[in-house]
Amino acid sequence: MIIGQLFRLKSPRDPANIREVRKHLLPARLVCRRWNSIATEHLYQTLELAHTGTVNGDETGFEGWNKTLDIEAARNAAERVIIQSCSEKSRQFGDWENWKNGEYDAFTSAIKRIKQLPNIRAIELHFSEKCKGRWSNLHNPWNDVEPSETRLDTLKAVFEAIRERAVQPNTEVSTIQSLTIHNLQNMPHQEFVNSGLFKDVAKDIDRLHLLITEEYNEDGPDRDILMEERLEFESHLQRQFLPCFAVNLTALTLNFHECWGTMPGYFDGAGLVFPRLKTLNLGNFVISNNRHFDWVLSQKSLETLRLDSCYIVSHIQVDTEETKEWDLHREDWQRLPKGSYGIFYDNAELYRFDGTWESTFDKIRNNLPHLKDFRFDRQSYRPHFLHPTRIGTVLHPSRYINFDAGTGPSPWLTSDSETGEMYFGDYECSMNRSEETKQGDARAFRDLLSACHERHE
């Protein structure tokens, strides 16, 4: 009981917490045989493959991992593996020399050892947050950013190890059913996604959790919305990536560091059917038309829906030249005359979308008959990606957002988190959609929560 309380003090999803708990559990094994047995089970339940020791192309770079896997009790106790894609040295000093011609034998050999873990059911792959897209690879010399090439090589190595583990002859192993990718780069890899390797692994996954990261710009992200990956990836995610997992998924998390779903890329989930989906977590998703959320409403099996910092866009300013390739869905937008809100730029197009959370909440209540748990909140800093159950139930004032393509560093203009006040164009012009819609939004929010509560009983 004491050991169990110790283990619950820290979140088991955080690698730093795992290492902290492990420091306390190691001496507990010395108390008696019973404590040794209990502590061992907790100690090795989650294993972390991290770059440790001297990373010089040989096995010493993964000494901790390899020593742990040499212990039979550890191999049998492991249920989850966290794989760190690169070392702190690589992130700080841009040392990527271990990856040569797409090969890093010490790392890939360490990854392959998951075949020796008969009881794991979950894999987490943690990339670094910074990444470079195609344009930066050609024009910018930043070496402290994890390259897209090594990211893909790591992803392939993990998938290959999962597949090889599943088809080992004369060996009974659990099926790896949960896949978490932290900081997956928003770069389409169609050849890999269309490969037999990808599909062989995807067919067994029933819990998929993705946090997407995007182009890192050392000089500021004010032009990042023009990078081609921001235009391409969401369509790729909808049409190629997710369909490979759709049949068996019971839980899905789609979270981006940046606002997504509306522009420059567009995601409306059209054609996506998840017949077994029970839990859906969305982070930073922006609704921009009256049918934008229909893909969620069509998942009739949903029992839990969590919206973490999701918004409805209110006012939009785009540049006709810079955004002409964007797949803008203007059908529910009202065009505003030039000069509105003090915006007189020659290429500026101004729009307003009158969508409300009142309408969205009512649709959720009426279209998801099995929904029992609904969460709606705004993150304070980082997304609740690894801890979705911490998402609250708050009708926060910043639930509406504006978009101004001419504003930096980000074109997404979030509302004041306390008052809901919004800015657009001339900063002497202000608006407050949360106040305008407060009565209707609050009524629909209460009705939705009440319906979920009744279904629990």
Where are these regions (language model features)?
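Short regulatory "switch" loops immediately downstream of catalytic or recognition motifs
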Residues: 4-14, 24, 51, 86-90, ...
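Leucine-rich repeat
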Residues: 34, 40-45, 58-67, 72-80, 88-274, 288-294, ...
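Leucine-rich tandem repeat or coiled-coil scaffolds
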Residues: 80, 87-97, 116-124, 129-153, ...
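Leucine-rich solenoid repeat modules
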Residues: 9, 49, 275-457
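A structural signal for well-ordered alpha-helical segments within the folded catalytic domains
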Residues: 29, 33, 105-108, 118, ...
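Hydrophobic regular-secondary-structure patch
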Residues: 1-102
